[in-house]
From Swiss-Prot:
<dbReference type="GO" id="GO:0046872">
    <property type="term" value="F:metal ion binding"/>
</dbReference>
<dbReference type="GO" id="GO:0006241">
    <property type="term" value="P:CTP biosynthetic process"/>
</dbReference>
<dbReference type="InterPro" id="IPR001564">
    <property type="entry name" value="Nucleoside_diP_kinase"/>
</dbReference>
<keyword id="KW-0460">Magnesium</keyword>
<keyword id="KW-0546">Nucleotide metabolism</keyword>
<keyword id="KW-0067">ATP-binding</keyword>
<dbReference type="GO" id="GO:0005524">
    <property type="term" value="F:ATP binding"/>
</dbReference>
<feature type="binding site">
    <location>
        <position position="87"/>
    </location>
    <ligand>
        <name>ATP</name>
    </ligand>
</feature>
<keyword id="KW-0963">Cytoplasm</keyword>
<dbReference type="InterPro" id="IPR036850">
    <property type="entry name" value="NDK-like_dom_sf"/>
</dbReference>
<comment type="similarity">
    <text>Belongs to the NDK family.</text>
</comment>
<dbReference type="GO" id="GO:0006183">
    <property type="term" value="P:GTP biosynthetic process"/>
</dbReference>
<dbReference type="GO" id="GO:0005737">
    <property type="term" value="C:cytoplasm"/>
</dbReference>
<dbReference type="InterPro" id="IPR023005">
    <property type="entry name" value="Nucleoside_diP_kinase_AS"/>
</dbReference>
<keyword id="KW-0547">Nucleotide-binding</keyword>
<feature type="active site" description="Pros-phosphohistidine intermediate">
    <location>
        <position position="117"/>
    </location>
</feature>
<keyword id="KW-0808">Transferase</keyword>
């Protein structure tokens, strides 16, 4: 199976609710290698740039205001089939639809404040990783 990289974001509500360590532990327990990690407090411009594909949707302003409301942690995860596996661990975007035991079922407060983000495709993963990380800030088997 092909080794992939994906981006995951631990969002402000999960950090505020002291779930950061538990969420990271769950990624590690699922055999992801964390090959890049940063804690950031996004500016409005950074949040708008990251979520640009949603700019014409009704929830855009609420999403941006939430994402700048506190610190986030961005992670580059590496494993075989990383994108699908990360999405499985995260759960459905709407926590009401998330399967018990997924991160969103356990830590999301609402559809907007849904605790975590995960890339949904290889193309998105590459774009999102490059949005937050320079090549020299990501380490792992793909770089050796």
């Amino acid at each position: 199976m092909t080794i992939e990289r994906t981006l995951s974001i631990i969002k402000p509500n999960a950090i505020k609710n002291n779930a950061l360590g538990t969420i990271i532990h769950r990624f590690i327990s699922a055999n992801f290698n964390i090959i890049g990690m940063k804690m950031l407090h996004l500016t409005k411009a950074q949040a708008k740039g990251f979520y640009t594909e949603h700019q014409h949707k009704s929830f855009f302003n609420d999403l941006i205001n939430f994402m700048i409301s506190g610190p986030i942690v961005v992670l580059v995860l590496e494993s075989p089939d990383a994108i699908r596996r990360n999405r499985d661990i995260i759960g459905a975007t709407n926590p009401v639809d998330a399967i018990a035991g997924t991160l969103r079922a356990d830590y999301a407060d609402s559809l907007i404040e849904n605790a975590v983000h995960g890339s949904d495709s290889l193309t998105a993963a590459m774009r999102e990783i490059n949005y937050f990380f320079l090549a020299g800030e990501v380490y792992g088997s793909m770089y050796q």
